[in-house]
């Protein structure tokens, strides 16, 4: 872990005016797992509230466990942490804590993943999960104008039958959450769980009119990115950094402007890259890909949106123009209606003109 921190901190510091520009930059977040925003302090508080015993004696001890070597070592802790989420209020509190941090980072719109199977497997009703998350998002929209949507994600280490069962359990809630629930995603352990494993359930979701996204090309090969596009018919690729290994795929991603929701600090923490200065984000951007910056599981990976932008700006020496391009790509890649999307793009233009 020390090496990772050093790989960011040894880079020459950013100019104060660029830091200020990044912090105020309007942003959209498109790759965020709500369960991955569970900070140790809240995790401990919820454990106490619900009488859940944790294998860690303190918040500090839990933070020390966040030294991951790969995706699986992170997932083991992630699923253990989710056990403290039991009531609608728990899901509300977690979601509201994320909103507070996001608004502080000038996130104007977020499309948020949630994993119902993580909770229904533990006996938590799917209605509880939807209700808690939605209550926080609706409250934030009404009080602060915080724009958001939710994407229900299937866990790829489980079976397609399980995904179908989850879909059928959730569909009766669709009308109630029509203002928020816009899409279907696919996440969890990529190795050994190719996209085609979920071809039928994604076809069904497509028939139902959901937007489709999938994690691909994080630890999995470029072929998984191609299969997510051609077999699952997704509109966005979550991660996708390994696409660079396939020049033909790179050309396609650039020509079709298929968005990649890249998560730099996540890639560093999970050892997808061993040094942020080696991250391929800038190369992907310069190759004409619709690259975006996101925080993934910020409580576990040490940074929300501003931290991710600051890390790549410093390590990759990105210019204001490149940073604005990343922000613009994200607004354009949202699943918002055209008018709402245009409004956010105008806000971005206005910010850039004023700064």
Predicted features and spans:
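Metal-cofactor-binding active-site regions of metalloenzymes
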Residues: 2-210, 219-224, 231-236, 242-355
């Amino acid at each position: 872990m020390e090496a990772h921190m050093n790989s960011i901190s040894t880079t020459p510091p950013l100019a104060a005016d660029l830091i200020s520009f990044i912090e105020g930059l309007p942003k959209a977040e498109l790759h965020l797992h709500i369960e991955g925003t569970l900070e140790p302090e809240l995790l401990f508080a919820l454990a106490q509230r619900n009488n859940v015993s944790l294998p860690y004696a303190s918040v500090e001890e839990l933070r020390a466990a966040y030294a991951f070597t790969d995706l699986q070592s992170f997932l083991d802790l992630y699923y253990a942490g989710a056990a403290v989420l039991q009531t609608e209020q728990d899901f509300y509190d977690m979601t509201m804590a994320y909103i507070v941090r996001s608004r502080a980072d000038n996130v104007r719109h977020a499309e948020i993943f949630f994993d119902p199977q993580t909770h229904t497997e533990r006996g938590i009703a799917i209605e509880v999960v939807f209700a808690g998350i939605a209550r926080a998002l609706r409250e934030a929209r009404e009080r602060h104008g915080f724009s958001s949507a939710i994407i229900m994600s299937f866990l790829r280490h489980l079976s397609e039958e399980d995904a179908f069962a989850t879909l059928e359990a959730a569909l009766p809630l669709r009308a109630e959450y029509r203002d928020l629930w816009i899409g279907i995603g696919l996440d969890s352990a990529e190795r050994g769980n190719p996209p085609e494993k979920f071809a039928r359930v994604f076809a069904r979701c497509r028939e139902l009119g959901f937007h489709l996204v999938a994690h691909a090309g994080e630890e999995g090969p470029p072929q998984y990115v191609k299969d997510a596009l051609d077999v699952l018919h997704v509109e966005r690729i979550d991660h996708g950094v390994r696409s660079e290994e396939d020049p033909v795929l790179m050309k396609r991603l650039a020509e079709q402007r298929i968005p990649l929701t890249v998560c730099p600090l996540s890639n560093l923490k999970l050892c997808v890259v061993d040094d942020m200065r080696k991250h391929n984000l800038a190369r992907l951007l310069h190759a004409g890909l619709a690259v975006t910056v996101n925080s993934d599981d910020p409580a576990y990976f040490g940074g929300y949106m501003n931290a991710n932008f600051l890390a790549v700006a410093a390590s990759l020496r990105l210019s204001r123009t490149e940073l604005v391009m990343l922000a613009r790509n994200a607004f354009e890649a949202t699943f918002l209606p055209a008018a709402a999307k245009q409004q956010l793009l105008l806000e971005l233009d206005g910010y850039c003109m004023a700064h």
